[in-house]
């Protein structure tokens, strides 16, 4: 078990987070598919800024799965708000044409899914790794 620490705290807080682009548009499709690495780099950089470790992540055509370790000093909702808000600004800065499809400041949909991860972390990690393949099979 991976135990992290803060000044007076030992912690192991893992969360499975799923969020989607506005209107559930297939962003990781066609021309934007080449820019998946760019979106992944943006999300990774923003996580590092908040000391959040990405255990596993997958960007599917119409949603994103992330298994992350969030320190207890940071609430899940504030982290997801930060991640979606800042990544929107950075994505629109690099891909200005998307502003017309999504509106000026709304790349991601309003909500998200979050689940705590306990002893089943390996199973969730496998699920995220296989998610892209499963999505392609159903399309």
Predicted segments with their positions:
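Charge-rich, low-complexity N-terminal segments
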Residues: 1-139
């Amino acid at each position: 078990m991976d135990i992290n620490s803060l000044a007076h705290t030992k912690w192991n807080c893992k969360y499975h987070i799923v969020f989607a682009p506005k209107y559930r548009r297939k962003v990781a499709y066609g021309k934007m598919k080449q820019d998946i690495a760019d979106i992944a780099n943006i999300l990774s950089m923003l996580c590092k800024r908040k000391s959040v470790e990405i255990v596993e992540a997958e960007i599917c055509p119409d949603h994103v799965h992330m298994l992350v370790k969030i320190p207890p000093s940071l609430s899940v909702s504030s982290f997801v708000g930060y991640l979606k808000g800042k990544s929107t600004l950075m994505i629109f800065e690099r891909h200005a044409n998307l502003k017309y499809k999504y509106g000026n400041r709304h790349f991601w949909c309003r909500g998200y899914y979050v689940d705590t991860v306990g002893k089943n972390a390996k199973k969730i990690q496998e699920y995220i790794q296989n998610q892209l393949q499963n999505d392609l099979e159903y399309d």
